Amino acid sequence: MPRRREVAKRVILPDPKFNDRVVAKLVNVIMVGGKKSTAERALYGALEVVSQKTGEEAVKVLKKCLDNIKPTLEVKSRRVGGSTYQVPVEVRADRRVSLAMRWLVKYANDRSEKTVTDKLAGEILDVYNNRGAAVKKREDTHRMAEANRAFAHYRW
């Protein structure tokens, strides 16, 4: 953390196809090894599959999907005396979105479909319908925060 001044947030430009910042950010999360065009191809293909299967606008489905997995609470470790407590804290708005995207991509990659496009499309559709591993991750995070509610007074 810098001591002098607050670091300015980088502005992410909207993607060329959908003209949307959320899609551009998700492309950056999917990207591995600087291969942005490959990540774009995978996401655009997945959004195409999603729009065909749902009959709705792909970006709207994606945003609803991300809303379904945004966590509101998480736990952070806090050392008090000799023991470490898992203290529940609220998640900042920007972190909610980034966690949701990371979880979506992580659990999409863990799926058994053949291509990345199919994996992403499958996970987006599952999360849209409140199923899938990413939804389970959000529920587990909330459950963990609820279980450690007794330590909420250690918040900083």
UniProtKB/Swiss-Prot annotation:
One of the primary rRNA binding proteins, it binds directly to 16S rRNA where it nucleates assembly of the head domain of the 30S subunit. Is located at the subunit interface close to the decoding center, probably blocks exit of the E-site tRNA. InterPro entries: Ribosomal_uS7, Ribosomal_uS7_bac/org-type, Ribosomal_uS7_dom, Ribosomal_uS7_dom_sf. Pfam families: Ribosomal_S7. One of its GO terms (biological process) is translation. The lineage of its organism: Bacteria, Pseudomonadati, Thermodesulfobacteriota, Desulfuromonadia, Geobacterales. GO terms for cellular component: small ribosomal subunit. GO terms for molecular function: rRNA binding; structural constituent of ribosome; tRNA binding. This is Small ribosomal subunit protein uS7. Gene3D superfamilies: Ribosomal protein S7 domain. Part of the 30S ribosomal subunit. Contacts proteins S9 and S11. It comes from the Bacteria. Keywords: Ribonucleoprotein, Ribosomal protein, RNA-binding, rRNA-binding, tRNA-binding. Belongs to the universal ribosomal protein uS7 family.
